[in-house]
Amino acid sequence: MTPAQHERIQALCTEFRLPTIGAEVVKRFQADQQGPALETLLAVFELEASDRRQRRVDRLRRASKLPAGKTWESLDRSRFPAKLQQQLEELATGRFVDQTTNVLAFGLPGTGKTHAMAALADRLIEKRRSVLFVPTFKLVQDLLAAKRDLDLPRALRKLDHFEVLILDDLGYLKQRADEAEVLFTLIAERYERRSIIVTSNRVFSQWEEIFQSPMATAAAIDRIVHHSVITEFDVPSYRTA
């Protein structure tokens, strides 16, 4: 057994939270001249590690509430401009999550922005990132209900468990003042701490209709855009193609 294999066994034991086994198993097997048995043990450990990772991915995918079928493989990226394709490829690395960067996807209905962001999320889940996909209007109603029950802080903490929160179709429905308030609270809570992905048919100049006042609109845009990647889906609608 090679030194690299020894290190791999120790690394896997650390991953399994079995540090004592990691420290002792190689020494004891070698002392008993059980090299082939160590190789078998490594193979079993690798199988266990692979199975654990897949189970975690499956759990993350179930928790994400992503729309079915919107995967990276099913996304026809060739219909997008070269710049957008490059942006999506970079976002798929997941580095933006480490940097708590936000992503904004603008485009008319049918241009593929929701599919693209859901597909991006699916790729992130494969990298064992936690993601939640939710229509903005539904999340706003859930937060309003929590606020009425004096439970808004707990609801926000629950959302904080997700590294990436996808707000789909921001501005699809006009917000009332109380709805705009909880939406702004959510954005402010995640600012520079967790990433938000926003899809919207509305450009920034129309966001005052969402947040109800120039001051709240400017503050919301500032927090979302401060660390962000802006993607523009300037392509024909696939629904009319």
Label the model's feature ranges.
Residues 100-116:
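Walker A/P-loop nucleotide-binding motif
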Residues 1-11, 241:
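Intrinsically disordered, low-complexity and often Lys/Arg-enriched segments
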Residues 10, 14-67:
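Interdomain "pre-motor" coupling segment immediately N-terminal to P-loop NTPase/helicase cores
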Residues 92-100:
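Phosphate-binding P-loop
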Residues 100-104, 120-123, 127-143:
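Conserved post-Walker A coupling segment in P-loop NTPases
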Residues 70-92:
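N-terminal pre-Walker A segment at the start of P-loop NTPase domains
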